[in-house]
């Protein structure tokens, strides 16, 4: 950084001092202070120093002496230890440094000061991952390329970098400290990490920051989700980027190519939709044939005009194209979608962002414009005309043509006028109204003296830039020289003087273009006139080809190779450059093209260092400097304004025009705009299949809306009936449709083959940049590999080579297609595709290896096999049906051998088998204080609900702060969903999310902990809060009250909650006083009763948001809650709102009058806090305090809390208890009793779930507020330094970790085996929080806890009659059937899900209707819900649901309320996307939003149930499945001897042998539970507690139960393996499988019967023998 100071003298005037310094300087950088001394004959001493802005602490100083005309440089180094003066806002970069130059000579003394904004961005780190997308449990590799800002080509060494791995919820899951070593030579390898098996899908980030710059992060992003690699890539390529409303057709090219460059032939099914944020409207669907990978589809304009006769109404929409391509070679299906195709009137957009808005009369004025298509892409080779007008006169009109980037430029020389009007317009072969046009006004430069810089604006590296400087002034003879500077990335890299040419002609400066000027630099020059006037100008020059030919890859030999082939690469680059290599499967980029490292991304990172704000000079002398990123200070008062922001001010954008929509049907035209939607919704067919009269019951609103809906609905019904009498055409299902549709989320990744490889580093150590040849071996994948080289050198910085594409293929090969996962016991198909690219046909034998625990069609132990003939240049599919019997990963191996040939192919991939049931999560938290040493235990027992023989994943995480886990989940919308683990999806969710974010910002600002979480998170949270505030204002009514939606009645409680949050938010963002005080005034005027209480006339939708407010003593708790909100706003509104204090006093009097009668714990707690806020010494406050203290509950661990009543109407106990305890904690903090408060905090900490939240929203928000207040109020900050040793002796698990101040906010989850106790040994000092979470599949009950709701779920096949008919078809939406490949492209089947529920109120309920109600539907394997149906159910005026969400195969549906007097029913379709049989039943649950534990759960399945073996099951497959079942021995079979039974009981692995009577049989989900009363214990095994008459559970799968045939109350001999789990009574339970022995065993009373006497003799001998000998013999 250079500080330029000029001292000028004249004979008649005092000398002038000029300081020009970059307005943003870098912490830790060298500040080169250039002192330019002119026209002096004496020595000048200059003392230059840098100071902290507020404290004036001297940071650095140097003294230099100038002699005559020689300039000098003083170098100051700013360290990294500059104190941050704004402790409460440590994430902000608004801190200044004062630079002072004191000039002394015999005749002159002057001190002048400049201020520069301090930037912490000392460098940038380019981060590269080995691919852009991963699945859970996959390893991520990354590397970093660190660069300096001052010199991006100087590789920093011996600095440390902090690397944070941040998950999709914004939580730091891992922190790594990396030291840049000299041996790294520019490429720092990160420590690879594995994504946890249980991870939320979304975008993860790797943040890397240099030491000394804690708030500047460089990042790389990657996506995490389950995905597949497609078989081939489909591309949609419109001939035009936009659809113009005057075009008659829209032509689209459809291309499809395999990733080995082979072309796909087949059929493309193309659908066109109009979208504007509402339900997509199908415009047209058609099919086209693909020949050699290419096909053509055309959308006629007339199709659009059928929906909107007025073409301009289409401008409100965008066009979406979806296509499904079915290959004729192998009947494989892939899809593509192109969204956001604009429908426009103008084809082009013209901007001039790089052109100055100020001109200098009689000097050249340079104008550069950028022309883009309406979709934002560059308009290449487009004719442009330009004219400049002065009044009515036009100056030199010009015609140009854009280059490949859409750029063109021209120069004019304007006369001496004050204003120019510049008009630039495209001149293509389109009508005039379709051209693009830009009109702007340029103003005259403010000074009467000018300077002009004439340069070539784009230069290549290595060229020499000729700069011509021209001065225009009436004092031209006084100008002797120019001073110029070259700035790049905010740094002055070059400065000098140039003597002015005699005669006033242009003075030439030659500037060699060097790498440090790339990718863009500024040239600024000025001269000084007598009297001190400074005349300046600046220009921006682009530098290209910095990386051209600096790094490249080439392949020796042919570019097409076979898998496993060795290849030789030539790597050409800069000498001594370090190069990182990477090869990625092109199919990966087809799945996700985002997050790739590109050269453009590197350039943009470098450009962010530029502190200038415009491309050219500003309005006047100071503007030229400030716009170039410089501060200018002179002793004559000509100064720039101190810079306040690192970035540039944003230019306000023009608001988009609002486009009206034409009514879409003539029926709708009969109604006014207000009620038109009512008619349109009536025209649509209901997904529920209900008639108009039934639908009418759900229509709310004015009578006109109801009438419009009914009339239009009846007309549509009549029309459908008339059309249904006509002929129907149905596309029949073709044979190829029996194959699975490839779906991105269901198909397994190619785990056997790498998706990326070649992750190595090389050094160009040879001369001329040629590296020794690199030899690599290709993986086995048939694909094209995208090989990339990234180079970092001292001369060029970071450069990327053009990708080298390596095709890996064979003439004959096979591909194995597997779903991502299947459930145990479900029948599915293994699909193998045989590709033959030879000319002749091949006869092939394809075999599948036998896999233990997977049933297939093998016979007598032989491999399943199929013989097939594949034509030349063709493909064929062979399938192997299987039924997996064991959970886990199984290797599926396929081999194909060609008859008569010596070649073949083989593939092995992993099939993931998941357990039955539904996923469940159990969590526990504990707060631990350590003084020196502490040992404690946590139970880690396996739940009795776990699916038999399935895995339990248990994770344990530790954080060194009670609030850490909660805080990091409060900073953005996605993370809050992790904090509050209940559904969100209605209007009030905005406040649910704003409140915790606000509290977190206040807390972290107060305790100055942003650095440990990540300083970038503060700006993100501020932005999120601002968006929330802006969004919440849309719910405000004209009278300043609030409701969930504008049309709903105003809610007192919600308005008060808004007041509370706004009062807090004002501490961190700008909240208009009227927006805060208006709601307070509304409450006081409209919602306060005569007795001082506040009332609620319009309840919120989220009644759960209210927490304990409401129910018994609701009028008291409501008044207390509202009073608290008004109290918090008092400092802002106490004066402006009339009757403010009077209202509060009346509310206090009301509460005081009720204290003695209060019974509910929650009401006591909130009332006490409200009274304490108003007057803690009042009699009512003391009285309520006594009540609160008397109701305190103490735990043995020293914790204290307040237990709410279990019969509470509003919430289940734990949530209300948390909320009451939070108010209790706030009360103790008001009394400054921190010792007791600590005990309360400990209890609250242990109530949290794994994500840091509690049971609901209000208790989470209140607990966060109270705990944060405790942390802020505590007198001293508790430091932490704790060593932990976590062990589980039963599982041989041991993990050691350390928690320090640096890592206290880092959450590192560790996987721990389930079962047994966990021992935690802690040593050191500090407090930490330990959280444990278990994730498992639990047995889905057929019904559960249906005391609050009833629920019915039925499934029916979708009826052909639901297909859209004629003109009403687009209203009804596409009714997709199994056969409709043209509509859906691979949907296997369509079913209708019918759901009915009813509320069952309790005696103490005050309402006969539920509050906000949720239905959670777990989707059947391979099925997805029909979104169009769901949207219609939500958006139509006969509204059936309030909202819906789809996450991770779970559909969540919201209702405002459910009645108790009748069933509330609706229906929607579900579509089968993956072929599967023997589908396991899954659950649907209904519950009240604010009481998620009280669920009513029902099982559902397809019609027919598929509980037994599928009728499609082949004989061999069925027999295999049956073999896995326990086989009941023949009844009273005397051929089975005593010895046979003894051997069976004593064989290895058999743990028990019991005789017991079956008391009960219960079906639970996919399993049957038998309750057995044990009569005789023959062999007890591990179950040492078992005795006769004891009860044990025996479990068998429902698919096996029919063969087993156990009956009540018969007696059986049962032998089998040990029980892995225990029931709720801590008793072992046993799974019956193929190793089990089940035999009917007669009771003694039956042994007198002749037909069983022989068998009974064997029975007695066996029992006696086992009792005497056991298994010892």
From Swiss-Prot:
The keyword Disulfide bond applies. Keywords: Cleavage on pair of basic residues, Complement pathway, Disulfide bond, Glycoprotein, Immunity, Inflammatory response, Innate immunity, Secreted, Signal, Thioester bond. GO terms for cellular component: extracellular space. The keyword Transferase does not apply. C3 precursor is first processed by the removal of 4 Arg residues, forming two chains, beta and alpha, linked by a disulfide bond. During activation of the complement systems, the alpha chain is cleaved into C3a and C3b by the C3 convertase: C3b stays linked to the beta chain, while C3a is released in the plasma. The alpha chain is cleaved by the serine protease complement C2b component of the C3 convertase to generate C3a and C3b following activation by the classical, lectin and GZMK complement systems. Phosphorylated by FAM20C in the extracellular medium. In absence of complement activation, the C3 precursor is first processed by the removal of 4 Arg residues, forming two chains, beta and alpha, linked by a disulfide bond. Precursor of non-enzymatic components of the classical, alternative, lectin and GZMK complement pathways, which consist in a cascade of proteins that leads to phagocytosis and breakdown of pathogens and signaling that strengthens the adaptive immune system. This is Complement C3.
């Amino acid at each position: 950084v250079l500080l330029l100071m000029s001292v000028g003298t004249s004979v008649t005037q005092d000398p002038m001092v000029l300081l020009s310094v970059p307005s943003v300087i870098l912490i830790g950088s060298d500040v080169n202070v250039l002192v330019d001394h002119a026209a002096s004959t004496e020595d000048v001493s200059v003392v230059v120093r840098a100071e902290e802005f507020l404290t004036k602490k001297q940071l650095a100083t140097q003294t230099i002496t100038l002699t005559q005309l020689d300039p000098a440089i003083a170098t100051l180094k700013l360290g990294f230890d500059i104190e941050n003066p704004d402790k409460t806002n440590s994430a902000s970069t608004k801190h200044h440094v004062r630079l002072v130059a004191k000039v002394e000579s015999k005749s002159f003394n002057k001190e002048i000061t400049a201020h520069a904004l301090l930037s912490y961005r000392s460098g940038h780190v380019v981060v590269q991952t080995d691919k852009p997308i991963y699945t859970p449990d996959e390893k991520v590799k990354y590397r970093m390329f660190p660069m300096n800002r001052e010199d991006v080509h100087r590789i920093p060494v011996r600095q440390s970098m902090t690397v944070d791995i941040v998950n999709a919820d914004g939580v730091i899951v891992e922190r790594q400290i990396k030291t840049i070593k000299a041996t790294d030579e520019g490429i720092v390898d990160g420590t690879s990490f594995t994504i946890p098996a249980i991870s939320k899908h979304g975008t993860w980030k790797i943040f890397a920051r240099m030491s000394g710059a804690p708030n500047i992060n460089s990042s790389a992003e990657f996506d995490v989700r389950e995905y597949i690699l497609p078989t081939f890539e489909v591309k949609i390529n419109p001939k035009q980027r936009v659809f113009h409303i005057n075009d008659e057709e829209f032509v689209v090219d459809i291309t499809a190519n395999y990733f080995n460059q082979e072309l796909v032939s087949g059929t493309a099914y193309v659908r066109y939709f109009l979208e504007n944020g509402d339900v997509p409207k199908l415009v047209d669907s058609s099919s086209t044939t693909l020949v050699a990978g290419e096909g053509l589809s055309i959308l006629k304009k007339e199709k659009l005009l059928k929906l909107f006769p007025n073409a301009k109404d289409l401008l409100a929409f965008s066009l979406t194209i979806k296509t499904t391509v079915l290959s004729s070679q192998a009947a494989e299906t892939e899809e593509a979608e192109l969204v956001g195709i604009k429908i426009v009137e103008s084809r082009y957009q013209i901007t001039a962002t790089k052109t100055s808005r100020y001109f200098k009369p009689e000097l050249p004025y340079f104008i550069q414009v950028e022309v883009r298509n309406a979709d934002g892409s560059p308009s290449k080779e487009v004719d442009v005309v330009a004219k400049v007008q002065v009044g009515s006169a036009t100056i030199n009109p010009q015609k140009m043509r854009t280059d490949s980037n859409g750029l063109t430029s021209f120069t004019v020389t304007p006369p001496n006028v004050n204003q120019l009007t510049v008009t630039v317009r495209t001149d293509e072969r389109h009508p005039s109204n379709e051209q693009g046009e830009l009109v702007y006004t340029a103003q005259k430069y403010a000074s009467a003296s000018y300077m002009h810089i004439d340069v070539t604006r784009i230069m290549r590296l290595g060229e020499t830039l000729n700069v011509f400087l021209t001065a225009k002034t009436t004092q031209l003879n006084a100008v002797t020289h120019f001073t110029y500077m070259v700035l790049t990335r905010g740094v002055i890299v070059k400065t000098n003087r140039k003597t002015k040419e005699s005669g006033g002609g242009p003075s030439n400066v030659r500037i060699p273009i060097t790498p440090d000027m790339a990718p863009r630099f500024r040239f600024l020059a000025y001269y000084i006139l007598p009297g001190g006037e400074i005349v300046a100008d600046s220009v921006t020059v682009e530098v290209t080809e910095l990386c051209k030919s600096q790094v490249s890859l080439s392949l020796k030999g042919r570019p097409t190779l076979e898998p496993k082939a060795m290849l030789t690469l030539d790597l050409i680059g800069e000498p001594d450059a370090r190069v990182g290599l990477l090869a990625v499967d092109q199919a990966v980029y087809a799945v996700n093209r985002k997050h790739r490292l590109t050269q453009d991304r590197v350039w943009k990172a470098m450009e962010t260092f530029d502190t200038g704000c415009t491309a050219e000079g500003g309005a006047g002398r100071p503007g030229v400097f400030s716009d170039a990123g410089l501060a200018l200070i002179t002793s004559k008062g000509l100064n720039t304004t101190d810079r306040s922001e690192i970035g540039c001010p944003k230019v306000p954008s023009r608001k988009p025009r609002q486009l009206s929509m034409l009514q879409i049907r003539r029926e709708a035209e009969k109604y006014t705009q207000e009620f038109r939607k009512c008619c349109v919704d009536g025209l649509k067919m209901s997904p529920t299949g209900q008639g108009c009269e039934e639908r009418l019951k759900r229509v709310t609103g004015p009578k006109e809306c109801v009438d419009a809906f009914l009339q239009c609905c009846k007309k549509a019904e009549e029309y459908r009936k008339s059309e249904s009498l006509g002929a129907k055409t149905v596309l029949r299902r073709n044979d190829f449709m029996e194959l699975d549709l490839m779906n991105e989320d269901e198909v397994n990744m190619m785990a056997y083959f790498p998706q990326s490889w070649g992750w190595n580093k090389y050094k160009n150590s040879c001369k001329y940049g040629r590296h020794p040849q690199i030899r690599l071996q290709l993986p086995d994948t048939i694909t094209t590999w995208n090989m990339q080289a990234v180079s970092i050198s001292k001369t060029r910085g970071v450069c990327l080579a053009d990708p080298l594409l390596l095709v890996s293929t064979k003439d004959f090969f096979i591909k194995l297609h597997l779903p991502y996962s299947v459930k145990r016991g479900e029948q599915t198909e293994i699909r193998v595709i045989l590709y033959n690219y030879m000319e002749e046909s091949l006869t092939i034998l394809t075999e599948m290896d036998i896999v233990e625990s997977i049933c297939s069609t093998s016979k007598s132990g032989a491999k399943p096999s199929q013989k097939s003939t594949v034509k030349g240049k063709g493909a064929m599919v062979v399938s192997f049906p299987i039924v997996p019997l064991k959970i886990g990963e199984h290797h599926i191996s396929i081999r194909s051998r060609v008859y008569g040939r010596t070649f073949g192919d083989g593939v092995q991939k992993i099939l993931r088998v998941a357990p039955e049931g539904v996923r469940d999560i159990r969590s526990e938290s504990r707060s631990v204080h350590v003084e020196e040493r502490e040992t404690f235990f946590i139970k880690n027992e396996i739940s009795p609900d776990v699916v038999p023989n399935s895995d339990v994943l248990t994770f344990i995480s530790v954080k060194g702060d009670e609030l850490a886990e909660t805080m990091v989940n409060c900073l953005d919308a996605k993370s809050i969903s992790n904090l509050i683990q209940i559904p969100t999806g209605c209007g009030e969710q905005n406040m649910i999310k704003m409140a915790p974010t606000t509290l977190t910002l206040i807390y972290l600002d107060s305790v100055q902990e942003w650095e440990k979480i990540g300083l970038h998170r503060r700006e993100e949270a501020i932005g999120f809060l601002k968006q929330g505030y802006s969004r919440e204002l849309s719910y405000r009514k004209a009278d300043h009250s609030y409701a969930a939606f504008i049309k709903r009645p105003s809610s007192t409680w919600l308005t008060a909650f808004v007041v509370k949050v706004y009062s807090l938010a004002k501490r961190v963002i700008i909240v208009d006083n009227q927006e805060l005080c208006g709601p307070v005034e509304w409450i006081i005027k409209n919602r306060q009763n005569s007795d001082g209480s506040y009332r609620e006339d319009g309840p919120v939708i989220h009644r759960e948001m209210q927490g304990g407010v409401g129910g018994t003593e609701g009028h008291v708790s409501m008044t207390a809650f509202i009073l608290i909100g008004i109290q918090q706003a008092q400092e802002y509104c106490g004066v402006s709102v009339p009757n403010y204090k009077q209202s509060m006093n009346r509310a206090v009097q009301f509460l005081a009058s009720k204290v003695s009668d209060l019974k509910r714990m929650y009401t006591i707690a909130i009332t006490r806090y409200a009274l304490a806020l108003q007057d803690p010494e009042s009699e009512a406050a003391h009285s309520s305090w006594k009540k609160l203290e008397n109701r305190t509950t103490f735990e043995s661990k020293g914790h204290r809390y307040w237990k709410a009543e279990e019969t509470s109407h509003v919430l289940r106990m734990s949530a209300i208890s948390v909320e009451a305890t939070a108010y209790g904690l706030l009360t103790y903090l008001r009394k400054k009793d921190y010792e007791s408060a600590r005990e309360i905090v400990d209890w609250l900490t242990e109530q949290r779930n794994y994500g840091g939240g509690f049971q609901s929203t209000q208790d989470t928000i209140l607990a966060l507020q109270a705990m944060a207040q405790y942390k802020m109020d505590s007198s001293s900050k508790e430091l932490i330094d704790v060593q932990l040793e976590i062990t589980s002796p039963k599982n041989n698990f041991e993990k050691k970790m350390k928690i320090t101040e640096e890592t206290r906010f880092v959450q590192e989850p560790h996987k721990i085996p389930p079962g047994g106790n966990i021992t935690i040994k802690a040593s050191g000092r500090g407090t930490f929080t330990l959280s444990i979470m278990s994730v498992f599949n639990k047995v889905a009950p057929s019904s559960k806890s249906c005391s609050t709701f009833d629920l019915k779920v039925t499934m029916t096949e979708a009826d052909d009659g639901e297909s859209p008919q004629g003109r009403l078809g687009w209203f009804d939406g596409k009714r997709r059937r199994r056969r409709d490949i043209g509509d859906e492209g691979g949907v296997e089947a369509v079913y209708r899900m019918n759901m009915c529920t009813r509320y069952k109120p309790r005696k103490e309920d005050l309402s006969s209707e539920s509050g906000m109600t949720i239905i959670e539907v777990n989707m059947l394997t391979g099925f997805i819900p029909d979104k169009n149906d769901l949207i219609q159910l939500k958006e139509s005026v006969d509204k059936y649901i309030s909202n819906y969400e789809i996450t991770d195969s779970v559909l969540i549906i919201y209702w405002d309320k459910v009645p108790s007097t009748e069933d509330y029913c609706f229906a929607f379709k579900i579509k089968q996307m993956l072929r599967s049989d023997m589908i396991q039943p899954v659950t649907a649950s209904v519950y009240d939003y604010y009481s998620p534990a009280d669920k009513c759960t029902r099982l559902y399945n397809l019609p027919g149930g598929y509980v037994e073996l599928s009728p499609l099951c082949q004989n061999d497959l069925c027999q295999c499945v049956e073999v896995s079942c326990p086989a009941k021995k023949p009844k009273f079979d005397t051929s089975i001897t005593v010895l046979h039974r003894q051997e069976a009981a004593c064989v290895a692995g058999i743990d028990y042998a019991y005789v017991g009577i079956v008391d009960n049989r219960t079906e639970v989900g996919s399993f049957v539970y038998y309750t057995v009363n044990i009569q005789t214990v023959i062999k007890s095994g591990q179950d040492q507690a078992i005795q006769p008459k004891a009860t044990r559970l025996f479990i068998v799968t429902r698919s096996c139960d029919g063969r087993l045939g156990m009956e009540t109350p018969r007696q059986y001999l049962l032998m089998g393996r040990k029980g892995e789990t225990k029931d709720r009574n801590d008793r072992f339970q046993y799974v019956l499988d193929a190793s089990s022995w089940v035999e009917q065993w007669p009771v003694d009373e039956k042994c007198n019967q002749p037909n069983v006497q022989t068998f009974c003799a064997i029975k007695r001998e066996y029992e006696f023998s086992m009792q005497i000998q056991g298994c010892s013999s």
